Amino acid sequence: MITGVFSMRLWTPVGVLTSLAYCLHQRRVALAELQEADGRRPVDRSLLKSKMVQVVFRHGARSPRKPLPLEEQVEWNPQLLEVPPQTQFDYTVTNLAGGPKPYSPYDAQYCETTLKGGMFAGQLTKVGMQQMFALGERLRKNYVEDIPFLSPTFSPQEVFIRSTNIFRNLESTRCLLAGLFQCQKEGPIIIHTDEADSEVLYPNYQSCWSLRQRTRGRRQTASLQPGISEDLKKVKDRMGIDSSDKVDFFILLDNMAAEQAHNLPSCPMLKRFAQMIEQRAVDTSLYILPKEDRESLQMAVGPLLHILESNLLKAMDSATAPDKIRKLYLYAAHDVTLIPLLMTLGIFDHKWPPFAVDLTMELYQHLESKEWFVQLYYHGKEQVPRGCPDGLCPLDMFLNAMSVYTLSPEKYHALCSQTQVMEVGNGE
């Protein structure tokens, strides 16, 4: 968990997107009239051609971001940082414009916390690297072996990679690519990232003033809410954590998940209350960023939705130059990205996103009707997005559902800079 300069050339102009969406809608209306005449038939999937895959994923297992204030501390041995040989894959990190890698304030912050045993906080471990390699192998099976969509060797003409500028995410991406392409490449691997103050691959409470203001009260009072407050007191009392210590369900879950992933001995009470801790962490997150607060959700993930939407529309536009589109788009994000993203798509399962989880968006075109479809998978399981009749969703219906939360860079900056903001649900 974590609490571009927008390169305008990387964003499709709003007017173009609107025109493309309108044309797509008109084409679907005409097709619907034909289908209505003879009765709508199920889509023949054998006539669907893969056009694009977009994957938003969480990094692999890591050390906790902040240790619990317990007398007996879990030991985080630096041997856990050993790099599995099969995950070795050279890469370069640039900013969005192709310039030098930006400074990472988060990594600097993590290096200020040394855990018992010698590891720094928030570091990707060997376990996490193996998880990401396994995710890459699953993607290889899906898009190289089962369906020959991607080349078996990495090619920068086929793959675009974007990550937050945090080392565990960059390294997770390396391991995923190693699994996906078995360490074979034709051309350099470039991972694009952004400055922390303009990053949109997580809800940016630091730079989006309105988002920070709208949620500030809820963040301060979340642990005081009925049910959450009583359960937090119970867990802290049983674990011997003083009531004055600033430990919430996020910190408890963070340590619990990290210890479980590495099979490390932990406080028995942490194991006993594992289910409650996860559920209350989810409840806390939904209190801070509720589904009823549309504008906050827009500011949290609206720009990322816009990026995903832009890629879809560029792919179906015959006027798009071949060098402006990729077959695969990879986005290395975080749990705090995935929760609101899944909420906006109507597929959040009220479970905390685990390490190395992925949200995969596939784009298809029907070979005969030329109609476009989107298919979503979360954690490898087919999903039915909000506003869609089933898993295989007509693209215009999917875009219409996304439009409720999608924000162009201009609208994002306008919303974030609002000077008067009314907090929603503060303490209620």
UniProtKB/Swiss-Prot annotation:
The active site is at residues 59, 335. It is found in: Mitochondrion. It is an enzyme of class 3 (hydrolase). One of its GO terms (cellular component) is mitochondrion. It catalyses: a phosphate monoester + H2O = an alcohol + phosphate; 1-(9Z-octadecenoyl)-sn-glycero-3-phosphate + H2O = 1-(9Z-octadecenoyl)-sn-glycerol + phosphate. Keywords: Hydrolase, Lipid metabolism, Mitochondrion, Phospholipid metabolism, Transit peptide. Residues 1-32 form a transit peptide. InterPro entries: His_Pase_clade-2, His_PPase_superfam, Histidine_acid_phosphatase. Signal peptide: none annotated. It holds the Pfam family His_Phos_2. GO terms for biological process: lysobisphosphatidic acid metabolic process. Its EC number is 3.1.3.2. One of its GO terms (molecular function) is acid phosphatase activity. Transmembrane segments: none annotated. CDD domains: HP_HAP_like (cd07061). Residues 58-168 are annotated as: Substrate binding. Monomer. Hydrolyzes lysophosphatidic acid (LPA) containing a medium length fatty acid chain to the corresponding monoacylglycerol. Has highest activity with lysophosphatidic acid containing myristate (C14:0), monounsaturated oleate (C18:1) or palmitate (C16:0), and lower activity with C18:0 and C6:0 lysophosphatidic acid. Belongs to the histidine acid phosphatase family. This is Lysophosphatidic acid phosphatase type 6. It comes from Pongo abelii (Sumatran orangutan).
